[in-house]
Amino acid sequence: MQYKYLLEYNKKNHECNPCHVAIIMDGNGRWATRQGKIRIMGHKEGFRAVKEAIKFSIANNLKILTLYAFSSENWNRPLFEIKALMELFLFALDTEIKNLKKHNIRFKVIGDITCFDKKLQNSIHYAEQITFDNTGLILNIAANYGGRWDIIESVKKIINRVQRGILDVNKIHENTISQYLSTSELLPVDLVIRTGGEKRISNFLLWQIAYSELYFTDVLWPDFNCHIFQHAIDSFVSRERRFGGFKKNKK
């Protein structure tokens, strides 16, 4: 589906609840430190917040929820923390697969998962396959993901098609780039929420959030709940999205 068409769809529905919400889940480590606990306990409590966000998304008829779980820069963290995160990811997949099916959720991972061990890769593939035909909420987990990586991979695929004579270089446009991104078949992101008090994007969905509304909260991710999610939605609905245009009351 062409990005231009999808963006037009968002424009027509911009006064309603967002269709696609993306969340930068920040603050797990700080939450644990404030509680006098080790960092991994913050990540475990953050898993509870993930389930809350999913429940809210279903209850409010959101079409797509994308969660930034592990960036390509997170490999710079201590090895024991990375190991614990991978184990938590595997545990979440193994324990929640029934709920994904029960609630008609389509599960998808965006990012380079080839760096993960085979057991985790197999669990990801299984979860994606078994939920592929589900028609409810689309749940994207960005794992070993970076916005620059996503764009580079898209460009590589385009170059390959040009070299093979499948694509005319003079017919490359914005829609072409979007078509080969990891989110190619999805609606553009309407709303980006970042928890933890920082006000930056951190290499997340750089192409896809060109016209997104941004919502920042000081709440640390483990403390995120349906009330905070609703506040972000209310903020989104109250805004006038211009998509590069001007205010309606201006002449």
From Swiss-Prot:
Keywords: Cell shape, Cell wall biogenesis/degradation, Magnesium, Metal-binding, Peptidoglycan synthesis, Transferase
Entry cofactors: Mg(2+)
GO BP term, example: polyprenol biosynthetic process
Keyword Cytoplasm assigned: no
GO CC terms of this entry: cytosol
Region forming the signal peptide: none
Gene Ontology MF, one: ditrans,polycis-undecaprenyl-diphosphate synthase [(2E,6E)-farnesyl-diphosphate specific] activity
Listed EC numbers: 2.5.1.31
Residues binding Mg(2+), per UniProt: D26, E213
Cofactor binding summary note: Binds 2 magnesium ions per subunit.
Active-site residue numbers: D26, N74 (proton acceptor)
Binding site for substrate: 27-31, 39, 43, 71-73, 75, 77, 194, 200-202
Function: Catalyzes the sequential condensation of isopentenyl diphosphate (IPP) with (2E,6E)-farnesyl diphosphate (E,E-FPP) to yield (2Z,6Z,10Z,14Z,18Z,22Z,26Z,30Z,34E,38E)-undecaprenyl diphosphate (di-trans,octa-cis-UPP). UPP is the precursor of glycosyl carrier lipid in the biosynthesis of bacterial cell wall polysaccharide components such as peptidoglycan and lipopolysaccharide.
Record-stated family: Belongs to the UPP synthase family.
Subunit structure comment from the entry: Homodimer.
PANTHER family linked to this entry: DEHYDRODOLICHYL DIPHOSPHATE SYNTHASE 2, DEHYDRODOLICHYL DIPHOSPHATE SYNTHASE FAMILY MEMBER
Name of the protein this chain belongs to: Ditrans,polycis-undecaprenyl-diphosphate synthase ((2E,6E)-farnesyl-diphosphate specific)
Organism: Buchnera aphidicola subsp. Acyrthosiphon pisum (strain APS) (Acyrthosiphon pisum symbiotic bacterium)
Gene: uppS
